From Swiss-Prot:
The keyword Cell membrane applies. It is found in: Cell membrane. The gene is SLC13A3. Belongs to the SLC13A/DASS transporter (TC 2.A.47) family. NADC subfamily. It is a multi-pass membrane protein. Keywords: Cell membrane, Disease variant, Glycoprotein, Ion transport, Lipid transport, Membrane, Sodium, Sodium transport, Symport, Transmembrane, Transmembrane helix, Transport. The lineage of its organism: Eukaryota, Metazoa, Chordata, Craniata, Vertebrata. This is Na(+)/dicarboxylate cotransporter 3. Li(+) decreases succinate transport in the presence of Na(+). Optimum pH is 7.5. Expression is highest in kidney. Detected in placenta, brain, liver and pancreas. GO terms for cellular component: basolateral plasma membrane; extracellular exosome; plasma membrane. The keyword Cell membrane applies. High-affinity sodium-dicarboxylate cotransporter that accepts a range of substrates with 4-6 carbon atoms, such as the citric acid cycle intermediates succinate and alpha-ketoglutarate (2-oxoglutarate), as well as other compounds including N-acetyl-L-aspartate. Transports the dicarboxylate into the cell with a probable stoichiometry of 3 Na(+) for 1 divalent dicarboxylate, rendering the process electrogenic. Can transport citrate in a Na(+)-dependent manner, recognizing the divalent form of citrate rather than the trivalent form which is normally found in blood.
Length: 602
């Protein structure tokens, strides 16, 4: 028995290598079960899907496999694969990442966060609302992981002020391995700094203590449960609102940009999705979901009942709220007066958002109509604005300097240096996006998309509204266990083909699939933000499952509502567009041999 256990441990420790070596062998039958080109393409896609789900290779390294495998297997020449990694969509995302880097460089995000918390008040349910609003707003422009990692230390400081000392933590023996595994699972290279900060702060303030309820009566179970719930409510609201906020803008999360890139690959004539049209659709959905999520989390953890805020607040709680208010005010004052660099970055950030929104908002002519049609994309706007960051001075310019020959002749630092951008921009995401676009191009060129469409024939009788609901549920479930980026890369080609089969607007199915990838609330391993919050040690898996189950359900229902109401007007979803009709004509007009092989397989 001991030998068996030792062997199992050996296998587990080498699991990534085993997956790496044996997956290609296990997938070999796929190559021979389909027509040659489609079979080889499906082999590559399934191989990448397994590697992404198991992380046998780093996600970004797996995304590079099409560069090697597509040319070797005769699916796509190298000169068609490599450009997919640097489409204009990638540059739009890169510009968003660089803008986020400048915001973080000058601590503008922290100033915004503390200001919002000062405005909403310090009652627990209101503070949870403030946390959620702040995190979701930041997540619209920063990465979900960065927003969560930035907000957690703020939440930690507020909670310690509310309760005087340390929150009663769960038994450290419980699920300690899950905490570690959750962090490792998502490869959070930015997390240790924040987690070390949280741990070191608590350790310094209270060495050797595990529970010091100085401010609350030791014999009061209700008070103990109250503060434990408040702690959980704070921590669980931050990753959830980060995931929700990322859906509101095209640059907020990677799946949104993958949708844009794959639309251009499958339907080159499609121009209805851009920053402005997406914001008009997704921002109201985000607000509704944020409100529903806040009510649910506040009901569970924040003292909110069906009759409003619970009354009979003790003097202890009143004093705790006064301390929290003082901590927030002190943290804000520690930032000092607003610097010139902060003002400059804020103005450029506003220009970035406004110009992207007004380029071609669809309901009115945008400023892009002043130029040659089709020449300008959102990438042009994004790159133009972030370029300014690298030469605009971080200190207020002065005319006197030119005439004062005694003044020091030192070069003023720009708002953002390239060295800083290199250090803070997650370049791996750019490669991951490119891998998704290369995969979509391979599906299109090999005819695999047509084969997939044939397999979806039994679904032609499914009502479109029901299809939207089913798609969102399936993808939301799948993304609980796999990266949302990998999930949408795998599913979007299938959804595009299903839309053609159903003769419905492709966006009617592709948008729910894309947004549904962000509805991963039930498990610590679902997203990096979930893992960060879980690794703090105050949450149990059952807390996330209990809270996240209804969050998932609300997200699915609200998304279905959006797709069948205002999205119909924004994207003209009630009609089958000409650009999709052209695609269906092109894919059915196949060479006779390919058509025969495909339908023989069916």
């Amino acid at each position: 028995m001991a030998a068996l256990a030792a062997a199992a441990k050996k296998v587990w420790s080498a699991r990534r290598l085993l997956v790496l070596l044996f997956t290609p062998l296990a997938l070999l039958p796929v190559v021979f079960a389909l027509p040659p080109k489609e079979g080889r393409c499906l082999f590559v896609i399934l191989l990448m899907a397994v590697y992404w789900c198991t992380e046998a290779l780093p996600l970004s390294v797996t995304a590079l496999l099409p560069i090697v495998l597509f040319p070797f297997m005769g699916i796509l020449p190298s000169n068609k694969v490599c450009p997919q990694y640097f489409l204009d969509t990638n540059f739009l995302f890169l510009s968003g990442l660089i803008m986020a880097s400048a915001i973080e460089e000058w601590n503008l995000h922290r100033r915004i966060a503390l200001k919002i918390l000062m405005l909403v008040g310090v009652q627990p349910a209101r503070l949870i609302l403030g946390m959620m609003v702040t995190t979701s707003f930041l997540s619209m422009w920063l990465s979900n992981t960065a927003s969560t990692a930035m907000m957690l230390p703020i939440a930690n400081a507020i909670l310690k002020s509310l309760f005087g000392q340390k929150e009663v933590r769960k038994d450290p023996s419980q699920e300690s391995e899950e905490n570690t595994a959750a962090v490792r699972r998502n490869g959070l290279h930015t997390v240790p700094t924040e987690m070390q900060f949280l741990a070191s702060t608590e350790a310094k303030d209270h060495p050797g203590e595990t529970e010091v309820p100085l401010d609350l009566p030791a014999d009061s179970r209700k008070e103990d449960e109250y503060r434990r719930n408040i702690w959980k409510g704070f921590l669980i609201s931050i990753p959830y609102s980060a995931s929700i906020g990322g859906t509101a803008t095209l640059t907020g999360t990677a799946p949104n940009l993958i949708l844009l890139g794959q639309l251009k690959s499958f339907f080159p004539q499609c121009d209805v999705v851009n920053f402005g049209s997406w914001f008009i659709f997704a921002f109201p959905l985000m607000l509704l979901f944020l409100l529903a999520g806040w009510l649910w989390i506040s009901f569970l953890y924040g003292g909110l009942s069906f009759r409003g805020w619970r009354k009979n607040k003790s003097e202890i709680r009143t004093n705790a709220e006064d301390r929290a208010r003082a901590v927030i005010r002190e943290e804000y004052q520690n930032l000092g007066p607003i610097k010139f660099a902060e003002q400059a970055v804020f103005i450029l950030f506003c220009m970035f958002a406004i110009l992207l929104f007004t380029r071609d908002p669809k309901f009115i002519p945008g400023w892009a109509s002043l130029f040659n049609p089709g020449f300008l994309s959102d990438a042009v706007t994004g790159v133009a604005i972030v370029t300014i960051l690298f030469f605009f001075p971080s200190q207020r310019p002065s005319l006197k300097w030119w005439f004062d020959f005694k003044a020091p002749n030192t070069e003023t630092e720009p708002l953002l240096t390239w060295k800083k951008a290199q250090e803070t921009v997650p370049w791996n995401i750019i490669l991951l996006l490119g891998g998704g676009f290369a995969m979509a191009k391979g599906c299109e060129e090999s005819g695999l998309s047509v084969w997939i469409g044939g397999q979806l024939h039994p679904l032609e009788n499914v009502p479109p509204a029901l299809a939207v609901l089913l798609i969102t549920v399936v993808i939301a479930f799948f993304t609980e266990f796999a990266s949302n980026t990998a999930t949408i890369i795998i599913f979007l080609p299938v959804l595009a083909e299903l839309a053609i089969r159903l003769r419905v607007h492709p966006l009617y199915l592709m948008i729910p699939g894309t947004v549904g990838c962000s509805f991963a609330f039930m498990l610590p391993v679902s997203t990096p933000p979930n893992s960060i919050a879980f690794a703090s040690g105050h949450l149990l898996v059952k807390d996330m499952v209990r809270t996240g189950l209804l969050m998932n359900l609300m997200g699915v229902l609200l998304l279905s509502l959006a797709m069948n109401t205002w999205a119909q007007t924004i994207f003209q979803l009630g009609t089958f567009p000409d650009w999709a009709d052209m695609y269906s004509v092109n894919v059915t007009a196949l060479p006779p041999t390919l058509a025969n092989d495909t339908f023989r397989t069916l």
